């Protein structure tokens, strides 16, 4: 399922994503009667289990590659690091996985030797998606993945994410403040306000009202 989580700035969307990734810092505390992803009870996971799950079973794409990517590492180094953290592969196998991830986001192999500062906004966003996909996650969290892009690139990136979800049978939580945009690309929409869910609808219910 592709689920959209929408709301104005400060409504709690990104904090919800951080909770699902186990990234809520103390004194913050996650409070829920149940919180699970892919059969994992996130309320009881120890740190070691979180490290194994995060970036592997659950992956996240952030909104701005200028801040999310390491500026002093090449694209290859960052993809390779994501793989070696979670999989025991030889160099040839890692190269195959890296090139597969690049093809998935429609980037040429030459990008591997570039640094983030040498990439356009759209290319940087595709690199972040490739890093998220390289370990074949079951769930992808995309936190405002198109907010730093123009309208043409926004649709390209969202169409790319949808295509990868369908090809990989991968679930996606798409976080945005743009309800009309995400409703086109998701099955269901949750609306948040001041940290609470205030509405829920099927995407076709929203589009039929436009």
List each model region and its residues.
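A short, proline-enriched helix->beta-strand linker immediately N-terminal to the Walker B motif
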Residues: 134-138
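ABC ATPase NBD coupling module
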Residues: 24, 29, 42-59, 77, ...
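Conserved ABC ATPase signature
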Residues: 115-119, 123
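A short, surface-exposed alpha-helical micro-motif characterized by mixed small hydrophobic
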Residues: 182-184
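Conserved ABC ATPase "signature" region
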Residues: 93-110
